[in-house]
């Protein structure tokens, strides 16, 4: 199973926040070969500053692959990034043009790029705690077969949730 991590999972892990143990369980599953973990290269725009920027370069040491992203002027790497889907971009523009003051916030451009690259690479599930992405999970699944979940829901679904055992 090919799992893409959103940037907020990395911050939780690196900053020793309360949900760090969930990220550690995902890393253990990857170390066992049960899942493949990846981040998209757009994470470099999410995390431009030290000390976390250099942490991106060490992700492969903990079992997280860095995949390409969507080609975007000013943020494009030959041989890594790929052209986007017109249908996906049209969908994003539809949502943005329909958005009105007071509506729930939409994902920002980096979030859209993470989701878009995840879809183009045929990955299985995108894990995040970002409310803007989670609010769109049903429509993303219906229109593009992009499965967006919280790490908690994912771990329960694959049968590794041990919260009932006090962990």
What are these regions (language model features)?
Residues 9, 43, 114, 132-133:
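Alpha-helix capping/helix-boundary segments
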Residues 2, 104, 115, 119-167:
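Acidic, PIN/NYN-like endoribonuclease modules and their adjacent C-terminal/linker elements
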């Amino acid at each position: 199973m090919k799992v893409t991590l959103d940037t907020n999972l990395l911050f939780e892990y690196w900053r020793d926040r309360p949900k760090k143990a969930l990220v550690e369980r995902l890393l253990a599953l990857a170390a066992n070969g049960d899942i493949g973990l990846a981040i998209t290269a757009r994470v470099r725009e999410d995390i431009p500053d030290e000390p976390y920027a250099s942490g991106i370069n060490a992700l492969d040491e903990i079992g997280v692959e860095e995949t390409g992203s969507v080609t975007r002027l000013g943020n494009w790497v030959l041989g890594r990034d790929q052209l986007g889907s017109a249908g996906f971009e049209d969908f994003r523009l539809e949502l943005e043009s329909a958005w009105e003051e007071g509506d729930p916030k939409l994902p920002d451009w980096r979030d859209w790029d993470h989701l878009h690259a995840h879809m183009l690479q045929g990955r299985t599930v995108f894990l995040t705690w970002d409310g803007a992405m989670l609010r769109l999970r049903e429509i993303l699944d219906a229109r593009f077969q992009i499965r967006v979940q919280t790490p908690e829901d994912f771990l329960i679904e694959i049968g590794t949730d041990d919260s009932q055992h006090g962990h």
